[in-house]
Amino acid sequence: MWWFRRRDRAPLRATSSLSLRWRVMLLAMSMVAMVVVLMSFAVYAVISAALYSDIDNQLQSRAQLLIASGSLAADPGKAIEGTAYSDVNAMLVNPGQSIYTAQQPGQTLPVGAAEKAVIRGELFMSRRTTADQRVLAIRLTNGSSLLISKSLKPTEAVMNKLRWVLLIVGGIGVAVAAVAGGMVTRAGLRPVGRLTEAAERVARTDDLRPIPVFGSDELARLTEAFNLMLRALAESRERQARLVTDAGHELRTPLTSLRTNVELLMASMAPGAPRLPKQEMVDLRADVLAQIEELSTLVGDLVDLSRGDAGEVVHEPVDMADVVDRSLERVRRRRNDILFDVEVIGWQVYGDTAGLSRMALNLMDNAAKWSPPGGHVGVRLSQLDASHAELVVSDRGPGIPVQERRLVFERFYRSASARALPGSGLGLAIVKQVVLNHGGLLRIEDTDPGGQPPGTSIYVLLPGRRMPIPQLPGATAGARSTDIENSRGSANVISVESQSTRAT
């Protein structure tokens, strides 16, 4: 035994990469860490340069003080020994190579190549850092050389503490940035999370409820756009469901009647069954053919409506004069007892050829249906401005009451008087759909206001442009209007351009 059940929809595939929240948080951490590192290097470099510059200034000041006091010349040994009570090391080298030194406990003033060059008189002054000391050597005017150094251990201790402070403060800054970035990202991406949950909800349950909108930023606009999409999807589903329901209702009546007639025909042809009179058989067969024609028309209308709802149209330049001519020929084959007064211009619409043809055909069919035998139907296509033309289809029928003029464009709507005539109630609905899809407008007015009958005129505003008029050989400026009554039979057609012009 086979059991059928509804297939559950596959869940949305989870991505293996980092979430947007984590990516934003990591980006914030990286940026803050980069800024902290750059600032730490800058602070360290500035403070280090300042401390070492201060040491150089201290050594320079101490040397100038010794030189200016004159003690080096009067009693160099005592002068140098006096420096032992300060925080520097000193050495005086006289021209006779007598050396006086005073050094801090545990320290030795280093003498290198730079200092020896000063002693030999090759350099006037030198500065260098060596063996944790900063050394200054100066050549005096009497030929002596003064060497002074200071330990860098206190400075290095300060710099070491500064490094730890910068490391700790930078780490705290990165951590705070990570926490703050996570909080801001979580709050900022909350609308995105709601959108994701709504999309997953729609995929799982077909629930099209809108999402609450908070604020007026970009994410709020994204939420509003998503809500618009949900509303459009809900309207599309509602139209689809209504179309299926209405189509089922409209198809049921002709199908039931057709089935009854076919069963009656089959029963009358069964062996031993009573035969129907010949005229009844003829009427029954004609009724079956009429019902089949009605079903074909209804199915065609439904296909056109669903095609327009789905947006399955190919847009191309369309010559409306040619559309009117072709539609007129089709209507005349069904109603050759109607006189058509047609006045058209060469107008080009960028749109769907099949849809525009069906729109024009339905308007003329509707006007012919409500016109008495021998009546007149007017079809006029005229230019209103540089980018708009107006198609008007008029009849002399009973007219449409004002309260029903909006309803006649609804699907399957049929007034009480229209139910006695053939039709599915979809013709003007298709007209409305095609016109709106092409950016046009519709309105209904009486052909003869106050007249009996008033008639009906349907006005269609179509955007487009005037078609260029090619000059034919031998044509004169006045030959702009051609009466093609003979080519139309009973149709009286007056065209602004000649028939041959529109056919090109």
Swiss-Prot record:
Segments traversing the membrane: 27-47, 164-184
Q: Which PANTHER family match?
A: SENSOR PROTEIN CREC (PTHR44936:SF9)
A GO biological process of this protein is: phosphorelay signal transduction system
Biased composition annotated in UniProt, kind: Polar residues: 487-504
Query: How does the protein associate with the membrane?
Result: Multi-pass membrane protein
* Reactions catalysed according to its record: ATP + protein L-histidine = ADP + protein N-phospho-L-histidine
Q: Which residues lie on this side of the membrane: Cytoplasmic?
A: 1-26, 185-504
* Extracellular topological segments: 48-163
Query: Where is this protein localized, as stated in its record?
Result: Cell membrane
Which Pfam families would you find in this protein's record?
HAMP (PF00672), HATPase_c (PF02518), HisKA (PF00512)
Q: What is this protein called?
A: Signal transduction histidine-protein kinase/phosphatase MprB
Q: Which organism is it from?
A: Mycobacterium tuberculosis (strain ATCC 25618 / H37Rv)
One MF term from GO for this chain? phosphorelay sensor kinase activity
Q: Which cofactor does it need?
A: Mg(2+); Mn(2+)
* Phosphohistidine, modified sites: 249
Q: What induces it?
A: Induced by MprA. Differentially up-regulated under different stress conditions, such as low concentrations of detergents and alkaline pH. Induced by low concentrations of sodium dodecyl sulfate (SDS) in a SigE-dependent manner. In strain ATCC 25618 / H37Rv, repressed during growth in macrophages. Highly up-regulated during the early stages of invasion of the human blood-brain barrier.
Record domain Histidine kinase: where: 246-466
* EC number of this enzyme: 2.7.13.3, 3.1.3.-
Listed A to Z, the keywords are:
ATP-binding, Cell membrane, Hydrolase, Kinase, Magnesium, Manganese, Membrane, Nucleotide-binding, Phosphoprotein, Protein phosphatase, Stress response, Transferase, Transmembrane, Transmembrane helix, Two-component regulatory system, Virulence
Gene Ontology CC = extracellular region; plasma membrane
